[in-house]
């Protein structure tokens, strides 16, 4: 039986649960449920604090876990990324009062409040900077106004919360984060894990691609195939119309409109883009 950790709340949890449902796994049901056994797939899901997930996986109590890259790194747990999931994107950065021109070098001897102390200590050590790291479990942005810290290090998505507190980021990004699946360091992916990962990957592919269908004169087929190469080449079928063919290929969702414009200029007709629910590539 496969044992997998899922964030118990927040945006990471919502997105993870949605992907699992699309991949054919049992849902959580009640929001306070701590674990769910999916009898059909012989998988048990454990809903844990995102910060704790890497620790459980590193200890071998769980096979895989979905968490944030920043959380896994900050835990110092012996885990490795198995797959990046493309949601929950954020950056971990230093911030200080916006009316002051801060540089990272100015952190020397200062107090830095954060919920990710290990990430900060590792970065400071790499830079050769001595500073006091103050661990807080939340509302880090208010710590400067309360006189607890001189600067902060926190997760930044839109920056709206920082601006409300009169803060601005400075220095390079410490950690570029997103949701990831982690496994124990040196973990050998067995068949059960492969099935799970393949399903999740299939959902991600479906989210990132569209299926494109169009008709085109065979004279322009070679040119159109360069525009829509697909994954292993497009599917080409003859039409009743003389010298015309129907073409089907997967295209990156973000590029779909540009690709359709190019095909139109080439003389393609009946260009249709449709959603892909599940994929195996």
From Swiss-Prot:
GO molecular function, one term: ATP phosphoribosyltransferase activity
The keyword Transcription regulation is annotated on this UniProt entry: no
Highest taxon of source: Bacteria
Species whose genome carries this gene: Corynebacterium diphtheriae (strain ATCC 700971 / NCTC 13129 / Biotype gravis)
Example of a GO cellular component annotation carried by this entry: cytoplasm
EC number, as in UniProt: 2.4.2.17
This protein's name: ATP phosphoribosyltransferase
Regulation: Feedback inhibited by histidine.
InterPro entries from the UniProt entry: ATP-PRT_HisG_long (IPR020621), ATP_PRibTrfase_cat (IPR013820), ATP_PRibTrfase_CS (IPR018198), ATP_PRibTrfase_HisG (IPR001348), HisG_C (IPR013115), N-reg_PII-like_a/b (IPR011322), N-reg_PII/ATP_PRibTrfase_C (IPR015867)
Catalytic activity line of the entry: 1-(5-phospho-beta-D-ribosyl)-ATP + diphosphate = 5-phospho-alpha-D-ribose 1-diphosphate + ATP
GO biological processes: L-histidine biosynthetic process
Pathway(s) per entry: Amino-acid biosynthesis; L-histidine biosynthesis; L-histidine from 5-phospho-alpha-D-ribose 1-diphosphate: step 1/9
Cofactor: Mg(2+)
Function per UniProt: Catalyzes the condensation of ATP and 5-phosphoribose 1-diphosphate to form N'-(5'-phosphoribosyl)-ATP (PR-ATP). Has a crucial role in the pathway because the rate of histidine biosynthesis seems to be controlled primarily by regulation of HisG enzymatic activity.
Stated family: Belongs to the ATP phosphoribosyltransferase family. Long subfamily.
Keywords assigned: Amino-acid biosynthesis, ATP-binding, Cytoplasm, Glycosyltransferase, Histidine biosynthesis, Magnesium, Metal-binding, Nucleotide-binding, Transferase
């Amino acid at each position: 039986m496969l044992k997998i950790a899922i964030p118990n709340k927040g945006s990471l949890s919502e997105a993870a649960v949605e992907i699992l449902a699309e991949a054919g796994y049992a849902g959580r049901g009640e929001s306070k449920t701590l674990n769910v056994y999916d009898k059909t797939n012989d998988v048990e899901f454990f809903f844990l604090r995102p910060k704790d997930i890497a620790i459980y996986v590193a200890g071998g109590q769980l096979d895989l876990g979905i968490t944030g890259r920043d959380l896994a790194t900050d835990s110092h747990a012996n885990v490795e990324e198995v797959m990046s999931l493309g949601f929950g994107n954020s950056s971990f950065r230093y911030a200080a009062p916006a009316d002051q021109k801060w540089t990272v070098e100015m952190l020397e001897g200062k107090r830095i409040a954060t919920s990710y102390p290990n990430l900060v200590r590792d970065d400071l050590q790499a830079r050769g900077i001595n500073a006091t790291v103050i661990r807080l479990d939340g509302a880090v942005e208010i710590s400067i106004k309360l006189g607890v810290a001189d600067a902060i290090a926190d997760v930044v998505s839109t920056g709206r919360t920082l601006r409300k507190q009169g803060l601005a980021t400075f220095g390079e990004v410490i950690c570029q984060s997103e949701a990831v699946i982690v496994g124990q360091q040196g973990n050998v992916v067995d068949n059960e894990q492969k099935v799970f990962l393949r399903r999740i990957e299939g959902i991600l592919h479906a989210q990132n691609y569209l299926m494109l269908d169009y008709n085109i004169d065979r004279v322009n087929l070679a040119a159109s195939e360069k525009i829509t190469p697909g994954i292993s080449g497009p599917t080409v079928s003859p039409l009743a119309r003389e010298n015309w063919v129907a073409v089907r290929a997967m295209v990156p969702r973000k590029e779909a409109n540009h690709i359709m414009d190019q095909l139109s200029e080439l003389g393609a007709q009946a260009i249709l883009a449709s959603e892909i629910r599940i994929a195996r590539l």
